[in-house]
């Protein structure tokens, strides 16, 4: 009996480790894509560059901006925000796994992102408030929650 418990525990740890690697890798890939879209297509006089002390004449920065690809507006202006939120949610998943306390962070970060957009709409925070950003945040949250539900339901029923 003890042997079976140890074997199941070891299998769980390996599976859990793989899930954490997958979620953290996806998070980093999404973060990179969002940053690339943002840096390569947005104006160099944005406040974010001052906040982060980014030299817009840096060679790497100039290299990233040298793209001839034309994207639709929603890709340039809404997709990076959605990818940043999804990146956070996936990294949160990698860190917390099955622990339900992760939903506290999901709620706080999602509410924060939505609040910033709403404050921007009323010019109470610098930036351009955009309803498509709000919609993209809600879509990302729904995708994340459905993914969690399906993933854990599959895992639960595949044991039987």
Where in the sequence are the language-model features?
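Bulky hydrophobic segments
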Residues: 2-160
């Amino acid at each position: 009996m003890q042997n079976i418990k140890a074997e199941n525990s070891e299998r769980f740890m390996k599976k859990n480790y793989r899930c954490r690697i997958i979620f953290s890798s996806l998070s980093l890939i999404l973060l990179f894509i969002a940053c690339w879209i943002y840096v390569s297509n947005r104006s160099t006089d944005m406040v974010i560059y001052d906040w982060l002390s980014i030299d817009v004449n840096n060679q790497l920065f100039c290299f990233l901006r040298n793209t001839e690809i034309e994207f639709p507006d929603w890709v340039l202006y809404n997709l990076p925000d959605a990818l940043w939120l999804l990146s956070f949610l996936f990294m949160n998943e990698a860190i917390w796994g099955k622990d339900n306390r992760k939903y506290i962070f999901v709620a706080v970060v999602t509410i924060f992102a939505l609040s910033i957009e709403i404050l921007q709409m009323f010019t109470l925070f610098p930036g351009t408030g955009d309803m498509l950003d709000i919609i993209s945040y809600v879509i990302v949250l729904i995708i994340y929650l459905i993914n969690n539900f399906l993933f854990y339901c599959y895992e639960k029923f595949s044991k039987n």
